[in-house]
Amino acid sequence: MSAPLKLKRQRSSEVRSQRKKSLVAELKPVASVLVDTPVSHLEGIYDYLVPQELSSAAVVGTKVLIEFGNTKTEGLILARKDLDASLPRLKPLLALSSPSGLIQPSTLKHIELVRNRFGGSFWNLLNQAIPSRVIREENVFLDKENVDEILPISEEIKSILGRADCLQLHTKEKLRWGLSLPLSVNPTWFISEIAKLRSHLGQVLLLVPDEKDLNSLRKVLHPIFGDNLVEYGSHLSKSLRYRNFLQIVDKCPQIILATRSGSFLPLRSNSTVIVFSDLDSSHYELHSPGWNTRDVTLLRSSDTSLIFVSASHSLEIERLMDVGWLERKRYKRSLNHNYGTSDGGQNYISQIKKAISKGNVLVSVAEKGYANLFLCSRCRNTASCECGGKLQISSEKMIPQCYLCLKIIVDWKCSFCGDNRPYVIAKGIDRTAEEIGRALNKTPILISSGSKQITELPSGNHVVLATAGSEPDGEYSGVILLDGERVFNRPSLRSEELARLLWFSLLCRADAEAEVFLSLPNNHPLVQSVLRNDSSYGSNLSLKERRLAKLPPYYRIAVIEGKNSEISKFAENLRGKSEYEITGPITLRGELSRLIVRSPLEQASNLVDLLDDVVKIQSIKARQVFKVRFDQFDI
């Protein structure tokens, strides 16, 4: 019996259906895809059909272009599976948007751990971990073979580290160290030697605060490792950054030099991550969800060695060393520094005169400018503008100007007593240079500050004045640390930590016979720390104070910003939970308020989940979502 006749449109529909089926991958035709969507409550895993022509390349860790709702967006393949008859009608993958398997499973696991700690969107973290695609770089990517080689150990590093620690660095696969830089030892040389010792055991990822540190290390390491050294960071062009990322993924170079954005880079087993100065603010990501290099590194796989190197460690690292999670390592050289302090009216000029005959002298000051704050010489009242702003003097011959409204006060007189003589109490770098110039009128003086930074010192002996972070590389026969009270007592949660880091970092540049002036009294804890050659001195007291005050590193802090009414309502709901400490709401501007929530370390994951859920509910209800940041550099 012949088959029943069918309408033409029925036959063509069946042909299209059969053709469609034949185009679907034969093996595991369904891909589980994590979809990149700006709507937080829709972020999730959805199933898509894998076309046959994409099947071999559409593996786990590949970015794909998909249709989601009425828009096209990116997705990430997390798994491949068989077709289930119970599944609804699925849409196909449209195209690949990355090389096949670009994102390794270890990287995905690492990102997920970071997301669990800081909350927010997985895709935000993924986009920060993986650079933007540049297709032409995939076409010109060169296939170079890297050759590992064992480098000799220098006698100088042996003498500093000691035989036992040097042997551990050279042979032990797994290390967790908190390492303090020794005074009068060049940090770039020291870190380079540590990297060389670890490089024959596995890859070494060096994470540094900024491009300046990266350039210094490159100058030392590139002549040794050549093409086996790869640089990575946001300072590179988009094309070069992507090219270097491909090389890191494909060729596994021995040494990777990177800034903060390299924190997620994939590494082989038994690799080493060296984090330099984790307390530096450049290690903190500003974009959501606001992670930092230290915590991202601590969340790496257990077969990775972690070495935190700093002139003075953050209290977070100090706590980990105190509980034994990190092993404390401190090294000392034989020094003959001549110390002077602010006790007894000691003057640093005499130490500059003594040091300048032997070499360059570094003078560290707190602020740029000339007279950033002045009083009346007679009655000691603050010089203020009519608008309430403080008056400043930008140079010796300039007239006072309001820092707030920029009004120039031509014939300034004290509004209290009528005197016209200013008394400067907050000197800037220019005023300090002027005073030193008067005392040493034949000595060349250089200023390195702001946009006018000196990277390399010219030949000859100079007095170099610099603000924090602007100091030229080099060794100094004198280090003069001014403005100690201002540096140590800034209105910041981390002011004491940062003052300690600044001073110990600069003392690493002093030669073994240097003249050193500390602008604080002899009994000050920071001065005692320097005199004992121990940057951790006093950290136990600081940690006890932080624990009692319910502050980091024993508490995690969430800063939440949103509309006044929403923040107030959320704060009231949260006050009923005894495990959280609430500060605020604090009115910011317009209709915005800020809430600060502190949680003990043991319960902080619950707070992360709670805030994630709140943001999702706000998104579902089409309300303005909260801006949430955990563990910011400062509050």
Predicted features by range, described:
Residues 60-63, 346-360, 435, 441-635:
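C-terminal helicase module of SF1/SF2 nucleic-acid helicases/translocases
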Residues 357-439:
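Cys/His-rich short segments
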Residues 153-167, 181-192, 393-404, 529-550:
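Short N-terminal or domain-adjacent regulatory/targeting segments
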Residues 206-207, 256-258, 306-309, 364, ...:
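Short, hydrophobic beta-strand segments that form beta-sheet elements in well-ordered domains
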Residues 290-294, 429, 496-500:
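Amphipathic alpha-helical segments in well-structured domains
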Residues 204, 306, 361, 515-516:
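Hydrophobic/aromatic residues located in beta-strands of well-ordered beta-sheets
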Residues 1-334, 338-343, 354, 476, ...:
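Accessory, non-ATPase domains that flank or precede helicase/AAA+ motor cores in DNA-metabolism machines
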